[in-house]
From Swiss-Prot:
One of the components of the core complex of photosystem II (PSII). It binds chlorophyll and helps catalyze the primary light-induced photochemical processes of PSII. PSII is a light-driven water:plastoquinone oxidoreductase, using light energy to abstract electrons from H(2)O, generating O(2) and a proton gradient subsequently used for ATP formation. It is a multi-pass membrane protein. The lineage of its organism: Eukaryota, Viridiplantae, Streptophyta, Embryophyta, Tracheophyta. The chain crosses the membrane at residues 69-93, 134-155, 178-200, 255-275, 291-312, 447-471. This is Photosystem II CP43 reaction center protein. Its main location: plastid. Residues 1-14 form a propeptide. The modification N-acetylthreonine is found at residue 15. The keyword Plastid applies.
Amino acid sequence: MKTLYSLRRFSHVETLFNTTLAVAGRDQETTGFAWWAGNARLINLSGKLLGAHVAHAGLIVFWAGAMNLFEVAHFGPEKPMYEQGLILLPHLATLGWGVGPGGEIIDTFPYFVSGVLHLISSAVLGFGGIYHALLGPEIIEESFPLFRYVWKDRNKMTTILGIHLILLGLGAFLLVFKALYFGGVYDTWAPGGGDVRKITNLTLSPSIIFGFLLKSPFGGDGWIVSVDDLEDIIGGHVWVGSICIVGGIWHILTKPFAWARRALVWSGEAYLSYSLGALSIFGFTACCFVWFNNTAYPSEFYGPTGPEASQAQAFTFLVRDQRLGANVGAAQGPTGLGKYLMRSPTGEVIFGGETMRFWDLRAPWLEPLRGPNGLDLNRLKKDIQPWQERRSAEYMTHAPLGSLNSVGGVATEINAVNYVSPRSWLATSHFCLGFFFFVGHLWHAGRARAAAAGFEKGIDRDFEPVLSMTPLN
């Protein structure tokens, strides 16, 4: 009688120490997993699993290169990036490539080079993935003992963790080196409306860097998302990179403590769940960063933040009505509060009207007009520069609002405003991805814990509905 499932299906998250175990093929009979279970069929085949991961990396890098070139081909220098639906070129521009004063794009060749390099890299990764999936040894340690691992081997797993941490730390230092030595990065706070500059005076004070982590996430505090100068951002990368590298070396040289051996589940599916949980946190954090932060994600490339667009509208109409003779310091609105200017609960002078809720916005085009107690009336009357007027009028009409059918802008505008902000796309996508990764974390964590406790049996293959259905062919 044909066996529809293997007993090894019942210990699917554990790898046996018996290295003589024959793993014949990649079908349901020999692995206990059907074709749609994906890489689960390769749990015990380290060579094939390596091929799957390398090929997956190739697909990711191919998308990056192809999408990069697609955006270069469609880019028009006469419009800002955020009006053109771009999500990759803004990242390259933020790193200081091809950008001039004020965020103007003066050279697209670096973007073309980036796309080509990613395509070439994806070809190398794709070849490596195909080689390891089809031609290389199924179990890699049979040919290369150095790469032998068993999911239950706690010491080997923490060594692999350490290697990953060192690589992540080196990645963080790549940004540091770019900012310090290789041309600098784009600083939206540079005088006169932003420019590329080298970062010379890093913030390395632990009280400042780790103070961000201890801040409240609410209101004007904003947790780490409140960072608003590049010295802090690059200094933070020095700290993160150093901690990752030191932590990686520590994990390579040490063995897990007894409490860690007891508290954690040591299986392939458990490691998957830990990774998904970490990625979920990354996704939610990136969502908040791209939505609220206009230093790491300059508005010149990503469009204004929601609060920024709102404050820009108040500023634009203050400029207009002041020219028409309005006394912006004394005019009252329909509620009796200041029409153009009012005081915040802490006594600062802020913009009046509905935008009062965004009174703690900080933006490069607005900060020069502040004094010690908020907005300075004398500066508003005498010091407003043309570039500030132009930028606020532009941001006012490009709020990061709108739906997927590209009817964007603010609610008072006509439907012809065909615009969805990259901030909307990036924040929404990272929130959704973060959420689904969190669900995946819970799912795989539950399965891993159940398997470790000995009562997870998976789907009963004897009574699977698909087995009683007519074959597709």
